[in-house]
Amino acid sequence: ALSLAMQTSYENGLYQFAYMQYHMLFMTAIYFVLLKLYVLHHNEMEQALYYLLKDRYNEFFGKENTKDGQLYFGSFAAIGESDVFKLLHIVGMDTNLEGELKKLVKERNDYAHANGRLLLTSEEFFLEKIRNFNHCIDRVFALIKHDILQLYASTLNDPDFYDPDIRAYLDPVQQIQEEIVKKYSLSRFELNWCRKFNIKQLESSENYASKKELHIALSKYYKELKSEI
């Protein structure tokens, strides 16, 4: 819905609104990355959150900031936007990227100020801002690429995932959708990495045919997603 609202604003020349909406989409992508880090680097994230939040730590994990007692992507919105980026140091974010991310937040705040001194009325200027967002999110996703590929490889090698006799869903596409895409909130970026995984390196492993079938199903699912854009 937010993506559609942004597109509508852009097509109607409402670049200021489109810019604000794109920033929200950008932060949502950041929150999903952080949620993945909470799963993949759980102990480090717990420690980082404790030091970052201090006396607000328990509140962060409280009922009002979780769903069914679990963190979800929106939980991270409870942390100030400039502060939440610090959690990316867990996967090697450098100070240059942190500075660029904080700059995006500062610019958004400047454009959102009620005095209206800064107005984004040019399509060219709007597209320049979007390129800045996209450049930064590409750098953020690059930080987790290795982790995602490791996750995919270990998942493919898990009998509970690949074995058709015991896995949750017999249909390979449904198994991919439910047990990896939804479970780990994988984006198109990450699915694209996974579909390029060299499945032949598992050729000598047990039940290779089932693993290959699931890998093909993931590639098919990715192509269907891409065709819908």
Tell me the role of every PLM-derived stretch.
Residues 135, 142-229:
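Terminal, compositionally biased low-complexity regions
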Residues 80, 94, 122, 182-190:
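Helix N-terminus capping/helix-initiation residues
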Residues 2, 101, 205:
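A contiguous, well-structured "functional interface" segment within a domain
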Residues 71-72, 77-86, 191-204:
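A mid-sequence interfacial segment
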Residues 68-74, 92, 173-175:
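A broad, low-specificity signal for short, low-complexity segments enriched in glycine/proline
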Residues 82-155, 159:
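Charge-enriched, short contiguous segments at helix-coil
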Residues 1-82, 147-165, 212-213, 220-229:
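Amphipathic alpha-helical interface elements
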